[in-house]
């Protein structure tokens, strides 16, 4: 059965054409349903309005296929928004905004406001314990105790290359992640607490730095907030056969942090042979690297 053309409907699909496409979408022939799916997707986000009521269809197969199309359309919207963010903003983009936009490209239905409220609540709990204490190593001790001991966040050493480790919502859901995304979480909590915490993009690792006029320490968030000295960082670089450069210990900008996160995901999806995601992250890397 041929998928109907819509050339006679410049203002959008007619009701008759929508009905025909839905009938074809529920067809048992995979070739027919696939063609109908492609035709509906070609309508873009405008198709969402008339598709949504069919999530309550009496036909299970139609409900399932409509839900999949709506999810795909939301992913496309999120992809467009994040790519525009990458192209529009430079090195000093807002890290939290970028991290949530990135997460929505894979999990388009996440409740970002809900996650942000949880981060606010975590910061409020820590702030209550700190009282009027100014930025100090004690602040890090309280933050680390709450994050790693009470809430149980940890580095995911067993499944280091799981893509979920790189999406902030999944890091919060599972309380585990990779070095860079755990550092983003730490960084965002530090910002809420007005602590001088920044990210540091070491070769083959990512840590945070806490610096005041009297103290400078590096925080290995992946290893439950282990505090490192400058000498420890240099020793790590020597152990991995990397010559030391002062720039390695410099603060990473938000844009460079997102670039590294996307580059990591691009490599992970390449290794997993997930070509669609690999191509998507290649676009993000190119866009972020322009700045």
Residue ranges and their predicted role:
Residues 1-291:
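A structural boundary/capping signal
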């Amino acid at each position: 059965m041929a998928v109907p053309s819509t050339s006679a409907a410049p203002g959008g699909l007619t009701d008759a054409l929508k009905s025909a496409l839905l009938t074809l979408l529920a067809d048992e022939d995979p070739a027919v349903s696939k063609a109908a799916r492609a035709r509906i997707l070609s309508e873009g986000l405008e198709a969402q309005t008339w598709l949504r009521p069919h999530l309550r269809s009496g036909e299970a197969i139609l409900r399932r296929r409509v839900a999949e199309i709506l999810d795909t359309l939301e992913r496309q919207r999120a992809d467009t928004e994040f790519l525009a963010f990458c192209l529009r903003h430079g090195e000093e983009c807002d890290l939290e905004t970028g991290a949530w936009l990135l997460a929505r490209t894979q999990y388009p239905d996440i409740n970002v406001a809900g996650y942000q409220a949880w981060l606010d609540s975590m910061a409020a709990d820590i702030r209550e314990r700190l009282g009027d204490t100014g930025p100090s190593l004690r602040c890090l001790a309280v933050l680390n105790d709450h994050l790693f001991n009470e809430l149980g966040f940890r580095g995911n050493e067993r499944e280091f290359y799981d893509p979920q480790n790189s999406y902030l919502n999944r890091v919060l859901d599972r309380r585990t992640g990779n070095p860079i995304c755990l550092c983003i979480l730490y960084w965002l909590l530090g910002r809420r607490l007005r602590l001088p915490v920044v990210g540091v993009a070491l070769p083959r690792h990512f840590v945070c730095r806490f610096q005041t006029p009297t103290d400078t320490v590096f925080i290995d968030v992946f290893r439950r907030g282990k505090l490192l000295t400058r000498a420890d960082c240099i020793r790590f670089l020597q152990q991995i056969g990397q010559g030391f450069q002062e720039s390695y210990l410099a603060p990473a900008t938000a844009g460079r942090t997102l670039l590294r996160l996307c580059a990591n995901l691009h490599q992970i999806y390449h290794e997993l042979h997930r070509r669609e995601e690999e191509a998507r992250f290649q676009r993000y890397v190119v866009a972020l690297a322009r700045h």
